[in-house]
Amino acid sequence: GDEAAAFDQFKKSADSDLAFVPAIGAFAAALIKKGQFKKARTLIQKTWSLAPHPSLLETYWQTEETADGLARVRSTEQLSKINPSHIESQVARVRAHLAALLWGEARHQLEDIESLNSDALDSRLCRLWAELEEGEHGDMAKAHAWLSRATIVDSQAAWVCGDCGNTIPDWMSNCGHCGGFNTFSWRRPLHVAGLNDQGMPETQNSLAIARPLDVELKSMK
């Protein structure tokens, strides 16, 4: 039937390119639907060594026998060790510790990301910091400061069309904006705070906005 044909197509796409995340995610989800959790885990682990991706983490968690927070932390640690220096492995550990309410370890992981990757701070990490401050201390002032900063730092990675710059959260074969085929790649979109009369980025203005928040947030850590 249609479901069997779709499964075969997912498998063919995954077999042809283990680094093609959309195909791997679709095939892993199909395996999970069939109850083949171990195969799905193995597939994601192979792809994680080549192209870690946040959507694969969500699917990986679905292969677990239990939703227990500590078990999920252990599972995520195993996955992240496959590609330990990649930013997605580091963020995966943060997300697992936050979900398990292990605030101290989550803070330690976030601080490590900042120290190891000077340009890593983006809107996603700001939101994780906000979640930590609200969850650990109930400090809404710090949480709101981080959420404010999320609006002015670089956007988190997304699927970006190489032809027109259209940005979408989930991969599509055709760009809905320009109609390009297979033009999406996973990367950070260009971030422009504003343009001056000459059409150039307002870099001084964006810096003026960012500095008070930088000072405020550093004083709060």
Which sequence ranges carry the predicted segments?
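Repeat-based scaffolding regions
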Residues: G1-S173, H177, F184-M200, Q204-K221
